[in-house]
From Swiss-Prot:
Organism from which the protein derives: Schizosaccharomyces pombe (strain 972 / ATCC 24843)
Family recorded in the similarity comment: In the N-terminal section; belongs to the HFCD (homo-oligomeric flavin containing Cys decarboxylase) superfamily.
Name of the protein described by the UniProt record: Probable thymidylate synthase
Functional pathway: Pyrimidine metabolism; dTTP biosynthesis
Position of the signal peptide: none
Residues that, per the record, bind (6R)-5,10-methylene-5,6,7,8-tetrahydrofolate: 527
């Protein structure tokens, strides 16, 4: 009996060695993942996707690039990982008779799953209409109906919302029964549009593949994170050219994902290698482990008036190279500042300072996976202040003096005699802020007397209910924490700015893994200079803490804003911040197990270890009261 064509393709000598596959790869019980990229700036994330896929057990990856995609991907970055890369020229040039392989057929036979990320509007249209004018579209047309296809569209907002696109989505879903779309996300695009269209976060794309194939990650000893060929996450040199862009006119850009990886490791952390070489490749040079540096929480030297009291000279941005991290999640924040500066309306405000403001900008999304803590790096955020304030909220405390005694002065202005009197709270002692955040979290509906009264078992303990529901009924759609109580607002020194948080549990990313906990916070009034960096860190910490107490893994923090503004006296300081290139976010670890902590009330500052926080210096900004 003659050998099957795909086996001959794997073993016989053909003119182009790039399409050779060893026979063991067809019978090796490995997961064969074919990753394709089309013409979109989002293709700069391809190397990150491939690297991450290679951190799973028993995975082999091959790559197909359309001709436009080759403008954004360095082939050498992929081949250095032991990955074969194919393009249109490889489809028929080796065919000189009936026994010769046809590349798009052989790749289809080899693959267990096809991932197209990004999927441009052009390729989507071809797929919906059955065109096969290049290697990828021919492969799609020849795809076995029962094999899964994962599709991550990316395009301009108006292209995504065009009715033709919706027809194409429906047609593809109808024709390819085992196809799934990884929907794009909302963001500020480079062309100036605001809305849906950017490719989904690359880590979420990898997670969908892992979930589909039920992949398990490789395990390594701590401190074994190494880079292939000395390269870090953003290995494409093209990345520098697009560091501040979000899309292009035809095929999308993607910058809502964090491209940095762990640069420090905890001695007790079980982490995953960034990539491993395939057995069939030659030995590759491995970079040395990054040195570990830890910033103790108690070592913050900045006494805060909203956390920023030290002025430093601007540090010039350094161009990205292929061996540097690119923190695209912090770039969301910086790009929103740019958008407000360019498009914001001048508005008066309660404090008399004046602002530039926009309403309901695209949400910001921050990955919390792998112990990530989104603590901004383009200025030093007063981490101890964030933690102490959060614990103060959790305890239901409303006395600003308790923070001041610890050197945290962010509430001093609102608790002053002058400010309380201006609010008509003349009977309150200095520092008594009334039934603000923590009181609503722990005693919602209780009658407020003063900050010294014992409110034990009074009102609704929303935070305790959140944790209980997450444990007992994690898929409940009413897991809500609200600080907005209209009846109590007249008694508050300052009505809450961040008013509403919802929690959401999703399935583990891999078999045997922990459920994933995400949170979404709505902020009615968002001070981009001082408040928002604090709020991002605070709610990310809260999500990590609740996940820790529930035995879950923190997954994502989503930040939704209403009146999003920049105070006029912050303009110069923020221009300095915009000149800085974001660095990698730090990692958060807990020093005690949940059972040793006991309850959410028992956390202390000493329970937190934040590693790898290496920000630029602080930037002085005045707090408007």
């Amino acid at each position: 009996m003659s050998q099957p064509l795909h086996a001959r393709f794997a073993t016989r000598a053909v003119k182009n060695p790039m399409i050779l596959e060893k026979e063991r790869q067809l019978t090796d019980s490995k997961y064969h993942i074919l990753v394709a990229a089309t013409g979109s700036v989002a293709a700069i994330k391809l190397t990150l996707i491939v690297k991450s896929l290679l951190t799973y057990k028993g995975v082999d990856v091959q790559v197909v690039l359309t001709d436009p995609a080759r403008n954004f991907v360095e082939k050498e970055d992929l081949t250095a990982l032991g990955v074969n890369v194919y393009n249109n020229a490889d489809d028929w040039k080796n065919w000189d008779g009936l026994e010769c392989p046809i590349t798009h057929i052989e790749l289809r036979r080899w693959a267990h799953l096809l991932l197209i990320a990004p999927l441009s509007a052009n390729t989507m249209a071809k797929m919906a209409n059955g065109l096969c004018d290049n290697l990828l579209t021919s492969l799609i047309r020849a795809w076995a109906p029962l094999k899964p296809i994962l599709l991550a569209p990316a395009m301009n907002t108006l292209m995504w919302t065009n009715p033709i696109t919706q027809e194409h989505l429906s047609a593809i879903s109808r024709i390819y029964k085992n196809s799934e779309f990884i929907m794009p996300i909302e963001k500020v695009l480079a062309c100036g549009d605001i809305g849906m269209g950017g490719m989904a976060e690359w880590r979420n794309i990898v997670g969908r593949v892992a979930d589909k194939l039920q992949l398990e990650q490789k395990s390594v000893l701590p401190n074994a994170v190494k880079n292939i060929d000395g390269q870090d996450d953003d290995s494409s040199e093209q990345t520098a050219a697009f560091e501040e862009y979000d899309d292009d006119d035809d095929d999308d850009v993607d910058d809502n994902e964090q491209s940095n990886s762990m640069i420090e490791t905890s001695a007790n952390a079980d982490i995953t290698p960034k990539a491993s070489l395939l057995p069939s490749t030659t030995e590759s040079s491995i970079s040395k482990d990054h040195e570990t540096s830890q910033a103790p929480l108690g070592s913050e030297s900045v006494d805060t008036q909203a956390s920023e009291n030290v002025t430093t000279k601007p540090e010039p941005p350094v161009p990205f190279t292929s061996s540097e991290y690119r923190n695209t999640e912090e770039e969301q924040y910086l790009n929103l500042i740019r958008y407000i500066l360019e498009n914001g309306q001048s508005r008066p405000d309660r404090t008399g300072t004046g602002t530039r403001s926009v309403f309901a900008p695209p949400q910001l999304r921050f990955s919390l996976r792998n112990n990530t803590l989104p603590l901004l790096t383009t200025k030093r955020v007063f981490l101890r202040g964030v933690l102490e304030e959060l614990l103060w909220f959790i305890h239901g405390d409303t006395n600003a003096n308790h923070l001041s005694e610890k050197g945290i002065h962010i509430w001093d202005g609102n608790g002053s005699r002058e400010f309380l009197d201006s609010r008509g709270l003349t009977d309150r002692k200095v520092g008594d802020l009334g039934p603000i955040y923590g009181f609503q979290w722990r005693h919602f509906g209780a009658q407020y007397v003063d900050c010294d009264t014992d409110y034990t078992n009074k009102g609704v303990d929303q935070l305790a209910q959140v944790i209980s529901t997450l444990k007992l009924n994690p898929y409940d759609r009413r897991i809500i924490l609200s600080a907005w109580n209209p009846l109590a607002i007249p008694e508050m020194a300052l009505p809450p700015c961040h008013i509403f948080c919802q929690f959401y549990v999703s399935e583990p990313c891999k078999p045997g893994g922990k459920p994933q906990l995400s949170s979404m916070m709505y902020q009615r009034s968002a001070d981009m200079g001082l408040g928002v960096p604090f709020n991002i860190a605070s709610y990310s910490l809260l999500t990590h803490m609740i996940a820790h107490m529930c035995g879950y893994e923190a997954a994502e923090f989503v930040h939704v804003m209403g009146d999003c503004h920049i105070y006029n006296d912050h303009l110069e300081a923020l221009q300095t911040q915009l000149e800085r290139v974001p660095k990698a976010f730090p990692k958060l670890f807990f020093k005690r197990d949940a059972k040793d902590i006991g309850s959410i009330d028992s956390f202390s500052v000493d329970d937190f270890a934040v590693e790898g926080y290496n920000p630029y210096g602080p930037i002085k900004m005045k707090m408007s009261v």
